[in-house]
């Protein structure tokens, strides 16, 4: 296995561990999610380039679109929680229910 794949997998695992350990604040969780999505994007791009299959190039672009949507929804939730409670704790998400 080339070293670049090991580095990308290590980046994904570090982001996953950050998501597991620092899950009390929404901002740190969003940053860890973005790190995971970035490493998945790079890994899928490298695999699509190695496959030499033209339709495989759609997968990284679709993943990038979903990552942008996830970031937009996460930032909207962060703004909503910050305006309502003044804090960015994840346990405040349960208080937004009607």
Curated annotation (Swiss-Prot):
<dbReference type="InterPro" id="IPR039428">
    <property type="entry name" value="NUOK/Mnh_C1-like"/>
</dbReference>
<feature type="transmembrane region" description="Helical">
    <location>
        <begin position="29"/>
        <end position="49"/>
    </location>
</feature>
<keyword id="KW-0679">Respiratory chain</keyword>
<keyword id="KW-0830">Ubiquinone</keyword>
<keyword id="KW-0813">Transport</keyword>
<feature type="transmembrane region" description="Helical">
    <location>
        <begin position="58"/>
        <end position="78"/>
    </location>
</feature>
<comment type="function">
    <text>Core subunit of the mitochondrial membrane respiratory chain NADH dehydrogenase (Complex I) which catalyzes electron transfer from NADH through the respiratory chain, using ubiquinone as an electron acceptor. Part of the enzyme membrane arm which is embedded in the lipid bilayer and involved in proton translocation.</text>
</comment>
<keyword id="KW-0249">Electron transport</keyword>
<keyword id="KW-0472">Membrane</keyword>
<feature type="transmembrane region" description="Helical">
    <location>
        <begin position="1"/>
        <end position="21"/>
    </location>
</feature>
<dbReference type="GO" id="GO:0005743">
    <property type="term" value="C:mitochondrial inner membrane"/>
</dbReference>
<protein>
    <recommendedName>
        <fullName>NADH-ubiquinone oxidoreductase chain 4L</fullName>
        <ecNumber>7.1.1.2</ecNumber>
    </recommendedName>
</protein>
<dbReference type="GO" id="GO:0008137">
    <property type="term" value="F:NADH dehydrogenase (ubiquinone) activity"/>
</dbReference>
<keyword id="KW-1278">Translocase</keyword>
<comment type="subunit">
    <text>Core subunit of respiratory chain NADH dehydrogenase (Complex I) which is composed of 45 different subunits.</text>
</comment>
<dbReference type="GO" id="GO:0045271">
    <property type="term" value="C:respiratory chain complex I"/>
</dbReference>
<dbReference type="InterPro" id="IPR001133">
    <property type="entry name" value="NADH_UbQ_OxRdtase_chain4L/K"/>
</dbReference>
<keyword id="KW-1133">Transmembrane helix</keyword>
<comment type="similarity">
    <text>Belongs to the complex I subunit 4L family.</text>
</comment>
<keyword id="KW-0999">Mitochondrion inner membrane</keyword>
<keyword id="KW-0812">Transmembrane</keyword>
<dbReference type="GO" id="GO:0042773">
    <property type="term" value="P:ATP synthesis coupled electron transport"/>
</dbReference>
<keyword id="KW-0496">Mitochondrion</keyword>
<dbReference type="Pfam" id="PF00420">
    <property type="entry name" value="Oxidored_q2"/>
</dbReference>
<keyword id="KW-0520">NAD</keyword>
